Amino acid sequence: YVQLANKDPELKKMLAGVINRQFKCINIDPYANAFNMNSEGGEWMSDLTDMKPELHERKWEIDSLCYPIRLAYHYWKTTGDASVFSDEWLQAIANVLKTFKEQQRKDDAKGPYRFQRKTERALDTMTNDGWGNPVKPVGLIASAFRPSDDATTFQFLVPSNFFAVTSLRKAAEILNTVNKKPALAKECTALADEVEKALKKYAVCNHPKYGKIYAFEVDGFGNQLLMDDANVPSLL
């Protein structure tokens, strides 16, 4: 709908509202993947994670922080409307950076995020007492869940790390051009460069039949999962 925003003032207003709402949600909890309208709680309040009444579900996925940036960027590029990049946006991008860096696991092998659910579906909860399989801190960002809401096997989810790289660079452009925040923009660019370098080093598999291909998930220790998922972002 973004490409039609300049032709429909009400559509443009709605898109701006969605963007602002997404930034607000990030600031409520950057680890959550689904939110309530207000603070009414929901069916997953019994999950063993840091649930809040504003949250519907708290499955940590990298792409949950990337899509709001991508939408806001293309809205701005199409309409020229920079009003969405307010203080809420600046707080949101600060939370994005903080969360991505926490999930690089450099300072803490486990990170602050943990998730368990009483369920019959193995992929609806995390192994290892809610921490997931271990990862080696190599510069990649850990994602507990895939865009499908299924738990990752190895937490360095490659397509979502690529998505983080492009999203951080979009954020840097906004911060430089609109907000005049070069230091914050530089932080985004530096993290994007670090993740991209790590992807080239750790996400490539030398397949006996197909040669060099990207793995779907890796852990930094040398384990690689060769598959793709129907959801986006995917390797395809």
Each language-model region and where it sits:
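Solvent-exposed loop and edge beta-strand segments that line ligand/cofactor-binding
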Residues: 1, 11-12, 51-63, 147-161, ...
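Aromatic-rich carbohydrate-recognition surfaces in CAZymes
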Residues: 1-124
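Catalytic cores of carbohydrate-active enzymes
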Residues: 29, 33, 101-118, 156, ...
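Active-site-adjacent bridging/hinge elements
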Residues: 39-48, 134-146
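Flexible glycine-/small-residue-enriched beta->alpha junction loops
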Residues: 65, 120-144
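Solvent-exposed, flexible loop/coil residues
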Residues: 88, 117-119, 145, 149, ...
